[in-house]
C-alpha cells in the first residue's frame, strides 16, 4: 500500500465539509445566544461517546433529569439523552475527523453510550476510516458521599470498539478491541475559582486511540483539570498517557487545552488544540514507539435535552 497516496478530490470534499461545519456552528451559536439563562455543563460526550471531556471519561454520568421531579415516573429510571459532535482537524497530518456520540443514564447510576467517527487520512492511503463504539459506565460512589464535602465521584466503565479500515489489515492489527477504566472526579468549590479535577486508570489495546486498530493490552493513566472563572466558561487541560500494546508498539501521550462555553442549559460549545505526537515517526524512522498523528484544532457542539 502506498502510504503517501494523494487524493485531490477527497481533499476538496473535506474542505467543503469543513466550511459547512463552521457555518452551521456559527448559526447555532447565534441562535443559542438568544435563549435561556441557565447553563449546562459536564460530562460532555467525548470522542468515543462516553460521558467525559475530549479523550477521557469523567466519573459523572450523562443525561439530565426530566422535568417534574419525583412526579415524573421516568426520573430514577432513565435520564434524558444527550448528544455531542466533534470536528478534529489534525493539520500536521492533514487528517479530518468527525465524531458523533450519544448517552443516557439508567437508574441514576449506569450510563449507556454509543459513538461513531468518520476519518479521512488520505495522505496515509486511507480515505474512509470508520470507528464504532458502545460504552457503559457505573457510578458506584456519589460526589460528597457520607455527608462530606471532599469525597469524589467514583466510576468504572468500559468501551467496546470496532475499526473498519484497510489500514488495520495492512498493519496486521485487530479490528475490534475494548477499554476498561476507573475514574474519580471532584468539583472543588472551596477555592477562589471552582476547579474540576479528574484522574483515572485505563486498560486498553488501542493503537492511536483505536483509529488504526487494536493489539495487546496495556495500562495507562489519564487526568483532567478545569477551572471555571465564570458561570458560563471553563478552561482546562487534558492528559492521556500512551498505552504500550505489545510488539514494540507504544502510543504517544495525548494533550489538549480547551475552552468550553456553556451557552445555555442545553448547549455547550468547545474549542481546543490537541497534540497526539509525531505524525511521521513510523513512516520516517520505522519506529513503533510514541505513535501519533500530529496536532491540530478541535471544535465540538454538545446538546443536553
Please give the residue ranges for each predicted region.
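Low-complexity, intrinsically disordered short segments enriched for Gly/Pro and polybasic residues
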Residues: 1, 8, 152, 195-199
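Cleavable N-terminal export/targeting peptides
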Residues: 1-54
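Transmembrane beta-barrel domains of Gram-negative outer membranes and organellar outer membranes
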Residues: 40-191, 203-207, 229-233, 243-245, ...
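Short acidic, glycine/proline-rich loop/turn micro-motifs
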Residues: 167-168, 210-211, 282-284
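A mid-sequence, solvent-exposed acidic-amphipathic segment
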Residues: 196-244
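Solvent-exposed loop segments that connect transmembrane elements
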Residues: 247, 280-292
Amino acid at each position: 500500500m502506498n502510504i503517501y497516496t494523494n487524493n485531490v478530490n477527497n481533499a476538496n470534499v473535506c474542505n467543503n465539509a469543513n466550511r459547512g461545519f463552521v457555518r452551521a456552528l456559527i448559526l447555532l451559536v447565534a441562535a443559542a445566544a438568544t435563549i435561556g439563562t441557565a447553563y449546562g455543563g459536564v460530562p460532555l460526550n467525548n470522542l468515543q461517546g462516553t460521558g467525559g471531556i475530549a479523550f477521557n471519561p469523567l466519573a459523572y454520568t450523562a443525561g439530565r433529569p426530566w422535568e417534574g421531579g419525583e412526579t415524573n415516573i421516568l426520573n430514577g429510571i432513565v435520564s434524558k439523552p444527550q448528544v455531542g459532535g466533534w470536528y478534529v482537524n489534525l493539520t500536521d497530518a492533514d487528517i479530518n475527523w468527525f465524531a458523533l456520540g450519544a448517552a443516557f443514564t439508567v437508574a441514576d447510576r449506569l450510563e449507556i453510550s454509543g459513538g461513531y467517527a468518520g476519518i479521512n487520512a488520505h495522505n496515509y492511503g486511507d480515505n474512509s476510516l470508520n470507528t464504532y463504539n458502545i460504552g457503559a459506565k457505573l457510578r458506584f460512589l456519589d460526589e460528597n458521599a457520607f455527608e462530606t464535602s471532599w469525597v469524589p465521584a467514583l466510576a468504572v466503565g468500559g468501551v467496546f470498539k470496532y475499526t473498519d479500515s484497510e489500514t488495520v489489515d495492512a498493519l496486521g492489527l485487530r479490528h475490534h478491541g475494548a477499554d476498561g477504566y476507573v475514574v474519580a472526579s471532584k468539583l472543588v468549590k472551596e477555592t477562589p475559582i471552582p476547579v474540576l479535577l479528574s484522574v483515572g486508570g485505563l486498560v486498553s489495546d488501542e493503537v492511536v486511540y483505536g483509529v488504526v486498530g487494536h493489539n495487546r493490552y496495556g495500562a495507562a493513566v489519564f487526568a483532567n483539570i478545569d477551572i471555571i472563572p465564570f458561570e458560563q466558561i471553563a478552561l482546562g487541560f487534558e492528559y492521556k498517557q500512551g498505552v504500550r500494546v505489545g510488539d514494540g508498539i507504544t502510543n504517544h501521550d495525548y494533550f489538549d487545552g480547551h475552552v468550553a462555553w456553556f451557552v445555555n442549559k442545553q448547549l455547550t460549545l468547545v474549542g481546543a488544540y490537541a497534540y497526539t505526537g509525531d505524525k511521521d515517526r513510523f513512516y520516517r524512522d520505522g519506529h513503533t514507539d510514541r505513535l501519533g498523528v500530529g496536532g491540530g484544532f478541535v471544535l465540538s457542539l454538545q446538546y443536553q435535552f
